[in-house]
Regions:
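C-terminal alpha-helical interaction appendages
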Residues: 1-90
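Cystatin/cathelin-like cysteine-protease inhibitor module
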Residues: 60-215
Length: 215
């Protein structure tokens, strides 16, 4: 099981190797990435409050905290800006297989809303699997999804996204099976539930759909 303490160490090692950041500064930046004002604040957590990355699906680094630490720490070597630095850290966590989920780069709710758009839904939801029952009775091939609306709601416990769209297909004209429809109206409910401090989230996805009659 990978614990957050190992994650902090992994981030610190990456910063030291990639940017030649001194150890004490690397620990402060790692803590900021994970949502802490300081490394001491991170260490103050009891063991029961430290989360395993196995229980987290999505990371949203604390960009504001990281930006402030970069401004407040003296004698840092040349570094990427806080956004790129967060992206580089996230890429390394994935490369080292410390974390395998999405790392979303968003400083506030407005930016997060733009990230959790139809492109994110398309990358993280396979409609062929989610709507397999409707597809099975349609006698059609499906492969084109169009999102009509994407609505975003944020609260203390996390964020929710509700989307609607059409999964478009084509009836197999060479088949002697009847055409029961080649369009599925679908709805998606995605929730990112806050699990660890302000950066770790559990993702749940629910998809429903109804085959549109061709008649």
């Amino acid at each position: 099981m990978v614990i957050i303490l190992d994650t902090s160490k992994q981030i610190s090692e990456f910063l030291r190797q990639q940017y030649s950041v001194r150890a004490s500064h690397a620990r402060e930046l790692a803590a900021a990435f994970l949502g802490f004002k300081s490394h001491a604040a991170y260490l103050a957590l009891s063991a029961g409050q430290k989360w395993s990355l196995d229980s987290i699906d999505v990371l949203i680094p604390d960009l504001e905290c990281l930006e402030q630490r970069l401004l407040n720490i003296s004698n840092l070597p040349p570094l990427a800006n806080y956004r790129q630095l967060a992206q580089d850290i996230g890429d390394d966590l994935r490369l080292q297989k410390v974390f395998s989920g999405p790392v979303l780069i968003a400083k506030d709710l407005t930016e997060l809303e733009s990230v959790l758009d139809s492109s994110y839904l398309q990358e993280n939801i396979t409609l062929e699997d989610e709507l397999s029952g409707e597809i099975a009775i349609s006698n059609s091939w499906f492969g084109y999804e169009y999102y009509d609306t994407v609505k975003f709601e944020a609260g203390r416990s996390g964020v929710k996204v509700h989307a609607t769209g059409v999964f478009d297909g084509e009836h197999d004209g060479e088949s002697d099976r009847p055409n029961h429809g080649d369009k599925i109206d679908f709805e998606v409910d995605l929730e990112l539930k806050l699990m660890a401090w302000g950066v770790g989230f559990r993702q749940t996805i629910a998809v429903s759909g109804e085959l549109r009659s061709p008649y």
